[in-house]
Amino acid sequence: KEIKAFRLNDSNRISPLTQAEKKTYQLPDSLDKISWFRVTKYLSEIFYGGYLLAGPVDIGPLDNLYSFNGIEGSRFRLSGKTNYRLSRRIYADFMLAYGTKDKKMKYDLGLKYSFNSLTKNPYSFPANFIGVQYTYNTFIPGRTIENSNYDRLSLSLTDIVDYRLAFNKSIFLEWLYETKKGITINPYLKFQEVKAYGDWTFSDRDSVEVSSFRKDRIGINIRLLFNGTWIQNQNKRITVGGNFTSMNINYEYGFDNTHLIKANAYRKVNLMPFGYIQLWAEGGYMVGRIMSPYLFTSSTYNSIIYHPNAFNLMKVMEFFTDKYIQLIAVYNLNGLIFNRIPYVRELKLREEFNIKMVYGGLRDENKFLIDNLDVKTFESKPYIEAGFGFRNLFQVLGVEYIRRITYSEGLPELKKWGIRATLGFRF
């Protein structure tokens, strides 16, 4: 079909292509015939996409193939998804995981039907698909379950292991529609049963401890992207370029008469020649008597790997709230200082400063939910951590020093600060 489309396009040209223009079309084909180029291209796709490309199936994410924690022990996971080589309409994804300590199998299976047959990915612009996902897997209570993804090898490289897990058994139905003006509409319906995993329980709305409960709800996500430019590969989309803004709004109604609204925004501002600033702002509010696994807790990344829009020194499940506001600011000087230091300028390092803060609370009617979780809510001050470091060492490496500014009382000195590494190209 692609060859016929090209011939039709070529035959309908007003003027024929010159020899130089024809060679431009032939260049990609000639490069693909060079063995070292094919190998480099294949390895680059694995590095950036995180998947092992195996014909009609992509195996990955590779960072999730193995992880370990104190509850499951060594967790082995095989997951992947089909790609356009199998079908440009129907896409499937799967996951199987097994823990050597708990000796339990976890799994999920998803199907997506794309209304756009010209793309190589259901999320390719402009996305338009319906999907269904069945999940039987563990998650960390308090995190957004759809994005918890705690079983990454990089997250296993930490000395912070005191978190709890729960089982999520759910059916998720969605429709995602994206306009050419950068607006994405994503209504969904979820039927879910949550079960505590291990020697702990939840508190229900009557302050009674229970080991499991149901949470069915309907919701909608709306995403807005302004002045955005992105790179689309087979597995993900990376927003690049200069000044752009993205916003997400999520509303959810629980069939137990609860409401959730959450919004976040990202803004990148170029200050050339003084570098650029990245800003993440986020807030959420819940109405009704919420079960403890659905309270808000900040995104953490307890690893030797630095994450720009998560808290690197906050413990998992350290703070629980039913309302919160969060701000993260990163200022990259783009070599403004290092480029003026002899010899150091040859390394082309990029200085970076960051500050992260979050503040929230629990209404009196929900405070009992955390009594048996050994967690806390905020006092009269926000949680703050800040750091500085450099990027672009050998084009891909970076080092970050982070300091915990508040809520550090009683912590050993080594828990108040940390050094983290980064790996990857910056756009």
Where are these regions (language model features)?
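Exposed, low-structure sequence patches enriched in small/polar residues
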Residues: 2-427
